[in-house]
A protein has these predicted regions:
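Charged, often low-complexity linker/regulatory segments
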Residues: 2-83
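A non-catalytic, helix-rich entry segment at domain boundaries
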Residues: 66, 81-85, 90-92, 97, ...
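Active-site metal-binding core of divalent-cation-utilizing nuclease and nuclease-like domains
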Residues: 92-151
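A domain-level signal for the structural core that forms small-molecule/cofactor-binding pockets
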Residues: 116-117, 152, 156, 170-173, ...
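Catalytic core segments in nucleotide and nucleic-acid processing enzymes
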Residues: 133-141, 151-162, 173-178
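Active-site-adjacent loop/helix micro-motif of nuclease/hydrolase catalytic cores
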Residues: 140-144, 163-175, 195-199
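Nucleic-acid nuclease catalytic cores
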Residues: 180-211
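Non-catalytic C-terminal interaction segments of nucleic acid-processing enzymes
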Residues: 206-238
Length: 238
């Protein structure tokens, strides 16, 4: 969810990412295309590409935290890195509609609507994932209507944030858990001084599988960098 020093979105505003042609179909699409079964070979290969792309982005931000001024630019760079992988390239047929689409998508609807506080009532509106990867086998089964409204359960999802702290990180974590994503990733980047760093890093320490997290924090005043790579059990000062 985009939420950095210059931008903020709540759940209602996220709905603006929904294309106009999807809104008229919401009440007509009642089923979703499920994610491929665990162990799917295509997904396993895609995971390798995704994790390598995230690691490259982390390395870039660790070395040069001001290459990108805002989070939108980081999203664009991540999409670029993902698209460099042959496994994730190309256009694939959407069932027998005669139309094709790509596998990497921005602002893909959440698999399951979240519950709103304080009533804990399920909100019919859905927020969006920052980046989602669909499998070709899913597109083969999806109707054009299911694709248009985003009713395809993405097996790989990435939430990327710049310059926010514990509350939003916890929200992104819960978003991924609520949608029961097969391969969920959090990318948490910061270059701001904050009294919330300790709380944020406690949340990071408590991230549980299947969610994986990559983290970089630049303490510009003290010229220190804290990093946690995907698969690493701890944050390492550099």
């Amino acid at each position: 969810m985009i939420n950095d020093e210059t931008q903020d979105k709540d759940l209602q505003e996220e709905q603006k990412a929904m294309p106009a042609d999807a809104k008229v179909l919401l009440d007509k699409v009642h089923t979703a295309v499920p994610a491929p079964p665990p162990g799917d070979e295509w997904v396993a290969e895609a995971v390798k590409a995704v994790e390598a792309s995230i690691t490259k982005l982390i390395d870039e931000f660790r070395a040069q935290p001001f290459i990108h001024r805002v989070e939108h630019s980081l999203h664009a760079r991540l999409m670029q890195l993902l698209s460099e992988w042959e496994h994730l390239r190309g256009w694939y047929p959407i069932d027998d509609s005669g139309f094709k689409t790509q596998l990497i998508h921005k602002e893909w609807p959440e698999t399951r609507p979240r519950k709103k506080e304080p009533e804990r009532i399920v909100d019919r509106r859905r927020g969006s994932f920052d980046v989602a990867i669909l499998a070709p086998s899913q597109l083969e089964k999806a109707t054009l209507e299911q694709f248009t409204v985003g009713r395809i359960d993405a097996p790989i999802v990435i939430e990327l944030g710049l310059g926010y702290w514990n509350d939003h990180l916890a929200s992104d974590r819960d978003k991924l858990k609520n949608s029961d994503v097969q391969h969920p990733y959090l990318v948490h980047l910061s270059r701001m001084p904050s009294g919330y760093q300790e709380k944020t890093e406690l949340i990071i320490a408590g991230i549980e599988a299947p969610t994986q997290i990559a983290y970089v924090h630049h303490n510009l005043e003290q010229k220190k960098v804290s990093v946690r790579y995907l698969g690493s059990p701890e944050i390492v000062p550099i």
